[in-house]
A protein has these predicted regions:
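Extended alpha-helical targeting/anchoring segments
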Residues: 1-227
């Protein structure tokens, strides 16, 4: 699968953001709203056989499916407060999408924006994305604020655009590099639930940023050779 929402907003004297996010947060086309949360990750296999095994393990994982469904329910609730009653629909659940370095489970939820509601109203109501807060949303954000000692900066926010024609498209700011003051930062993480295993969650976080880190290592080595 291709990145549905990747961007490089550009650089200025303060730095630059390079975003390769595979996750769509909110899209508005006319009155149709679309959100596509990701929950469930496995790395790509070293060969075709192992890759198929990892795909199957992800698709059959009750834990990953439960996490994904939890976020689907959260986002349906977020959309429901501004969208037409009865229009919020889970079009696809747990769809396997494969990228260069990982496999993901992706669900697709659509709705019809209610009369008098704008894309900006929708973004204000749904931000931050439920796939990176967890549920219950408000309490989860309070706990995150209590436990995390540092700001997430751009990580887990959103990058997007508003068109003069009323369209909007935004992502969840993951798989992203922040370049400032001669430093490059990237972040990786995963959802924590009752049956999470620390080692597996840590490995999932590493898998998500593996391609970014390896690319940076290659660029560093290439730069050193050219010097």
């Amino acid at each position: 699968a291709e990145q549905p929402w990747a961007d490089q907003p550009g650089a200025d004297q303060r730095g630059a953001i390079v975003c390769l996010s595979p996750e769509r947060f909110l899209q508005v086309r006319g009155s149709k709203v679309l959100t596509q949360p990701i929950k469930g990750t496995r790395r790509r296999g070293l060969d075709a056989a192992q890759d198929e095994e990892l795909k199957q393990a992800l698709c059959e994982s009750e834990k990953d499916r439960a996490e994904n469904l939890m976020i689907v329910d959260l986002l349906r609730n977020d959309l429901g407060s501004l969208c037409i009653t009865g229009s919020v629909t889970a079009e696809k659940l747990f769809e396997l999408q494969s990228f260069n370095s990982v496999h993901h489970l992706v669900s697709t939820i659509s709705a019809e924006l209610g009369p008098g509601q704008s894309p900006l109203d929708l973004l204000r109501n749904c931000f931050p994305g439920g796939s990176i807060t967890g549920a219950p949303k408000i309490r989860a954000m309070e706990i995150i604020n209590e436990l995390e000692p540092n700001s997430r900066s751009i990580y887990c926010g959103a990058i997007g655009y508003f068109g003069f024609d009323g369209q909007m498209d935004t992502n969840i700011t993951i798989r992203t590099l922040l370049c400032e003051q001669d430093q490059i930062y990237c972040w990786g993480g995963g959802g924590i639930v009752a049956d999470s295993e620390c080692e597996l969650e840590y490995q999932e976080s590493r898998d998500k940023v593996a391609l970014l880190l390896s690319t940076l290592q290659e660029l560093k080595a290439s730069s050193a050779q050219s010097d």
